[in-house]
């Protein structure tokens, strides 16, 4: 692919803006309570096993920790993004939707799976059974679709920075989010229709209930689980692997391009230069790029001004390289966590749909409880990966809550020494007339 030098600089600048945002938000993975209370309730109630106190205690402890972290983390994300107007970017709008679905998933999944599992009885009634299964499925679906949307948005911002600007707007993001919620509520309508309480007799001859999602036939049950496996795991997983794989490849090529540019700069003293200012170096997610300006600064190449400019260029190049490498590592983590959290529960559901007896025999009780717990973990990991690892978000958090020390408004502070260097550059430029420099942006 051959581009003019001016176009290459513009594309590279846009790409690095997105890399910054990626590192700042650090997505993928999402939550999950598997679609169905029936999973845990069936495995744990249909064939009760002798309870072990230490297993119950460990289960309660782990569920409580994950629940508290999920509620606290997602609530903080929602609060910061709503109250801080400066953080309402396109990607943050998707992250807000992700936090809402994660919070809803946590509230509707964990208590209504853990309590019946411990009591060996679904005590909440038929209406709650239908409602919780419906919101469980919807929250899982919305979370997954949000992750896919974030991966595609990042792909467009990094790999197609010029073309994607047409549709990377807040209004477009809101339309996509509204569509994902409407689609999810529509897809999951079978849950309130076919979820019911099923009575059974426990070992002590007492009658109890379990909340189960039962379709009229085994063929329909198998088709439904296959459908969910495709749209909520396999296809989203493939899309994210491809999108993040292409992003990583693009960034790797950018690293090689930077290395070649650095080598050329050593061999030939440059007469012109441009640099991409980094507002955050932990960036996981890129800001809207500003078209780079081509400045003829021969007059500034002498004395302390030239020395300072050369140091800034070198620092910016190093920051770009570090940011790209961090994004690649972050994307690998996102994909690995997505499959780690989702694969066990979807595999268990598919197994149960096609071989109920064998699945219940091997997964009943503790195994399915901890498989579900693993899927829940993603709802508390998402805020950490996508938000709290983002320097701008942390600054926004401290600005939102007065009780926290506030080092400055988000998006103002950058690398160590960068703010001072930026002021120095502006001061140096102000000493010279615009007749000594070209400020026209390169053609797209």
UniProtKB/Swiss-Prot annotation:
Disulfide links within the chain: 33-44, 129-211
PROSITE patterns named among the record's database cross-references: G_PROTEIN_RECEP_F1_1 (PS00237), G_PROTEIN_RECEP_F1_2 (PS50262)
GO biological process per UniProt: animal organ regeneration; axonogenesis; cellular response to hormone stimulus; cholecystokinin signaling pathway; eating behavior; feeding behavior; forebrain development; G protein-coupled receptor signaling pathway
Ranges annotated as spanning the membrane: 57-82, 93-119, 131-152, 173-193, 226-249, 330-350, 366-389
Ranges in the topological domain labelled Cytoplasmic: 83-92, 153-172, 250-329, 390-444
Membrane topology recorded in Swiss-Prot or TrEMBL: Multi-pass membrane protein
Gene3D superfamilies (UniProt xref): Cholecystokinin A receptor, N-terminal domain, Rhodopsin 7-helix transmembrane proteins
SUPFAM superfamilies in alphabetical order: Family A G protein-coupled receptor-like
InterPro entries: Cholcskin_rcpt, Cholcy_rcpt_A, CholecystokininA_recpt_N, CholecystokininA_recpt_N_sf, GPCR_Rhodpsn, GPCR_Rhodpsn_7TM
Record carries keyword rRNA processing: no
Tissue expression: Pancreas and brain. Also expressed in the gastrointestinal system and vagus nerve.
S-palmitoyl cysteine lipid modification positions: 403
Keyword annotations: Cell membrane, Disulfide bond, G-protein coupled receptor, Glycoprotein, Lipoprotein, Membrane, Palmitate, Receptor, Transducer, Transmembrane, Transmembrane helix
Its job: Receptor for cholecystokinin. Mediates pancreatic growth and enzyme secretion, smooth muscle contraction of the gall bladder and stomach. Has a 1000-fold higher affinity for CCK rather than for gastrin. It modulates feeding and dopamine-induced behavior in the central and peripheral nervous system. This receptor mediates its action by association with G proteins that activate a phosphatidylinositol-calcium second messenger system.
Homology family: Belongs to the G-protein coupled receptor 1 family.
Protein name: Cholecystokinin receptor type A
């Amino acid at each position: 692919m051959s581009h003019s030098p001016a176009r290459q600089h513009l594309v590279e600048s846009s790409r690095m803006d997105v890399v910054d945002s990626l590192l700042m938000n650090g997505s993928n993975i999402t939550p999950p309570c598997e679609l169905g209370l029936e999973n845990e309730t069936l495995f744990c109630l249909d064939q009760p096993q002798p309870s072990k106190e230490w297993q119950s205690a460990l289960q309660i402890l782990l569920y409580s920790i994950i629940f508290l972290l999920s509620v606290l983390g997602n609530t903080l994300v929602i609060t910061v993004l709503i109250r801080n107007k400066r953080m309402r970017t396109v990607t943050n709008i998707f992250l807000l939707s992700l936090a809402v679905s994660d919070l809803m998933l946590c509230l509707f999944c964990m208590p209504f799976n853990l309590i019946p599992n411990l009591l060996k009885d679904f005590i909440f009634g038929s209406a709650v059974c239908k409602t919780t299964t419906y919101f469980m499925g919807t929250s899982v679906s919305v979370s997954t679709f949000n992750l896919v949307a974030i991966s595609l948005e990042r792909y467009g911002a990094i790999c197609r920075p010029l073309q994607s600007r047409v549709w990377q707007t807040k209004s477009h993001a809101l339309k996509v989010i509204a569509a994902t919620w409407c689609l999810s509520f529509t897809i999951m309508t079978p849950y309130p229709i076919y979820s019911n309480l099923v009575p059974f007799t426990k070992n002590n001859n007492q009658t109890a209930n379990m909340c189960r999602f039962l379709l009229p036939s085994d063929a329909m049950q198998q088709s439904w689980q296959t459908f969910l496996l495709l749209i909520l795991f396999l296809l989203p997983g493939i899309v994210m692997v491809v999108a993040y794989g292409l992003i990583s490849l693009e960034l790797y090529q950018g690293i090689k391009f930077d290395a070649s540019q650095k080598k050329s700069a050593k061999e030939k003293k440059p007469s012109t230069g441009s640099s991409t200012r980094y507002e955050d170096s932990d960036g996981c997610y890129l800001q809207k790029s500003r078209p780079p300006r081509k400045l003829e600064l021969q007059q500034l190449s002498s004395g302390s001004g030239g020395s300072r400019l050369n140091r800034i260029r070198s620092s910016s190049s190093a920051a770009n390289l570090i940011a790209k490498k961090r994004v690649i590592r972050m994307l690998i983590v996102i994909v690995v966590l997505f499959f780690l959290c989702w694969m066990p529960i979807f595999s268990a559901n598919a197994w149960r749909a096609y071989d109920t007896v064998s699945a219940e025999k091997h997964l009943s009780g503790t195994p399915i409880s901890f498989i579900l717990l693993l899927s829940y973990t993603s709802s508390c990991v998402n805020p950490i990966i996508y938000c709290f690892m983002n320097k701008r978000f942390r600054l926004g958090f401290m600005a939102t809550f007065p009780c926290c020390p506030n080092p400055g408004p988000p998006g103002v502070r950058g690398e160590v020494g960068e703010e001072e260097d930026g002021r120095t550059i502006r001061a140096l430029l102000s000493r010279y007339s615009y007749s000594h420099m070209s400020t026209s942006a390169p053609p797209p």
